């Protein structure tokens, strides 16, 4: 898991296993383009939305997809990820630290919860270890429900990204899980308000 804190011994073990696997992939002729297919990017959108991931993710993943000849846009982030619940209570919007997230099960636990609720759109896509994402994560459990919530008791119901467009820009992404009630009331509720944000 990418959430392993740097000082942990597991981090070094993971780095070693990663290097070993890369060599095996060369011998197997398993290339990044075999793994990074449209369906894998759709899964990434879902997981990023459920963990309250960075607004940098759409920029970078869209660019990586485009480099591979896959069309992925900000509108895809809204279409695929907006309806997703926020499951991770992590700073800066939440209470807990990255180390707590790792101890609670990390990304594999979030994926497992999404799988149990049929929210991961493409559970059978292949991963770098030769197993599907479902095979890798389906048995992982949430070890701390204060840090990683269940779909039935999320932090927020609709927490993905929305794609904005208007006369100032063609496309901009907004992370809805960090929108507070106060911000929504002040800037997003009354279109006649002079301070309202209009898209």
Which functions belong to the PLM regions below?
Residues 1-199:
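Catalytic or ion-coupling anion/metal-binding cores of large enzyme and transporter domains
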């Amino acid at each position: 898991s990418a959430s392993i804190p740097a000082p942990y011994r597991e981090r070094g073990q993971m780095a070693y296993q990663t290097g070993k696997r890369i060599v095996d992939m060369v011998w197997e002729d398993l290339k990044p383009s075999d793994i990074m297919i449209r369906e894998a990017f759709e899964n990434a959108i879902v997981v990023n939305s459920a963990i309250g991931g960075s607004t940098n993710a759409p920029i970078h993943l869209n660019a990586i997809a485009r480099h591979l000849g896959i069309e992925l846009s900000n509108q895809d982030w809204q279409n695929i990820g907006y309806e997703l619940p926020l499951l991770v209570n992590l700073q800066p919007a939440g209470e807990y630290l990255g180390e707590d997230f790792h101890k609670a099960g990390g990304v594999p636990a979030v994926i497992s919860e999404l799988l149990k609720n049929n929210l991961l759109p493409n559970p059978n896509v292949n991963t770098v270890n030769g197993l599907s994402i479902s095979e890798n994560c389906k048995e992982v459990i949430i070890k701390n429900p204060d840090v990683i919530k269940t779909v039935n008791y999320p932090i927020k119901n609709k927490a993905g990204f929305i794609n904005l467009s208007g006369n100032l820009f063609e496309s901009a992404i907004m992370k809805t899980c960090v929108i507070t009630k106060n911000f929504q009331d002040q800037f997003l509720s009354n279109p006649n308000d002079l301070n309202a944000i209009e898209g």
